[in-house]
């Protein structure tokens, strides 16, 4: 009932201009007390290039099959496509990483907090109460998570009181998203307990304090994580180095190119194993026309094998 009440709150208020400076760009978005969200039409407009179906809230829904395929991606494979598209601000790093051996893949569910301002919070809480929501908290957003989501939280790098989850809410997030993951430009608490839960997480710091002195200002709106603007529904891919946020319109191309990159690396190492060539003769492009033709034939054969295997699953 609380989640349904939130949707009612989100959908019932009139559209107004942005109250906060960062949101001026998105004047069509709806402001509901201090809780700001995009309507389904807003999300559709701002992610219009997505080729995929959408959730009821308007977020692009990258297919489950592509999520599974994306578990094999590395940061370098993603970079190869995005830099060609001139999308050079899609990567964030410098995190503490929980379970770095476990790839993190899912659809971005974005949440924004700002430093507490009591007069704004009072109005927000009053309006929330009118719609059956006792408080606007971190759990307001967490309770909306779905399978395949990665919880993306802009807590403006806050350490003390910037703890989006402890072990209990981290466990709930793991169950709700089916081990999707968490990225927070902020902190977590109960690190010992969280470390035992099988879900990847990227966080700036750990701190024993509960979340506080902040206010929830956005759900499924553009948020900033490091130097990245993250949109709801972006494909989130995390590895040992950091996190990429891939716009949906590039997902298929990234995955296809990744196959080619892996095959190229596979062939290159085979040639190095033969011990007959200098590195410059093979990498990154074979200099000998016969070797180049050999590689192209190998690439074609392996692509056919890989795609046949995927079609059989």
Predicted regions, residues:
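Feature captures the catalytic cores and cofactor-binding loops of soluble hydro-lyases/lyases
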Residues: 73-77, 81-232, 246-313
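Channel- or pocket-lining gating/hinge segments that regulate access to a cavity or pore
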Residues: 242-244
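N-terminal secretory signal peptides that target proteins for export/translocation
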Residues: 1-11
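Boundary at the C-terminal end of the N-terminal hydrophobic targeting segment
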Residues: 31-33
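Bacterial N-terminal signal peptides
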Residues: 13-28
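Amphipathic alpha-helical packing elements
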Residues: 37-73, 78
């Amino acid at each position: 009932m609380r989640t349904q009440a939130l949707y009612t709150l989100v959908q019932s208020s009139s559209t107004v201009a942005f109250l906060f400076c960062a949101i001026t760009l998105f004047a069509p978005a709806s402001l509901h007390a201090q809780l700001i969200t995009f309507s389904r039409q807003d999300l559709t407009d701002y992610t219009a290039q997505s080729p995929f179906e959408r959730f009821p809230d308007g977020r692009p829904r990258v297919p489950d099959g592509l999520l599974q395929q994306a578990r094999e991606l590395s940061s370098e494979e993603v970079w190869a496509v995005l830099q060609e598209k001139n999308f050079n601000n899609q990567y964030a790093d410098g995190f503490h990483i929980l379970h770095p051996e476990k790839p993190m893949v899912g659809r971005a569910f974005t949440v924004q907090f700002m430093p507490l301002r009591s007069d704004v919070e009072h109005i927000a809480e009053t309006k929330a109460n009118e719609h059956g929501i006792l408080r606007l908290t971190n759990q307001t957003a967490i309770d909306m998570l779905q399978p395949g989501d990665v919880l993306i939280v802009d807590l403006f790098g806050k350490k003390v009181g910037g703890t989006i989850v402890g072990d209990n809410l981290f466990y709930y997030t793991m169950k709700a998203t089916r081990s999707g993951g968490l990225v927070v430009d902020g902190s977590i608490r109960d690190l010992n307990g969280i470390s035992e839960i099988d879900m990847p997480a990227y966080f700036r710091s750990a701190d024993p304090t509960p979340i506080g002195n902040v206010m929830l200002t956005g759900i499924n709106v553009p948020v900033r994580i490091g130097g990245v603007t993250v949109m709801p529904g972006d494909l989130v891919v995390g590895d040992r180095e950091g996190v990429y946020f891939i716009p949906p319109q590039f997902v298929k191309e990234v995955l296809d190119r990744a196959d080619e990159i892996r095959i190229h690396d596979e062939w290159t190492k085979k040639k190095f194993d033969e011990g007959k060539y200098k590195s410059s003769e093979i990498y990154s492009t074979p200099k000998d026309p016969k070797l180049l033709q050999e590689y192209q034939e190998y690439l074609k054969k392996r692509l056919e094998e890989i795609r046949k295997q995927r079609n059989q699953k």
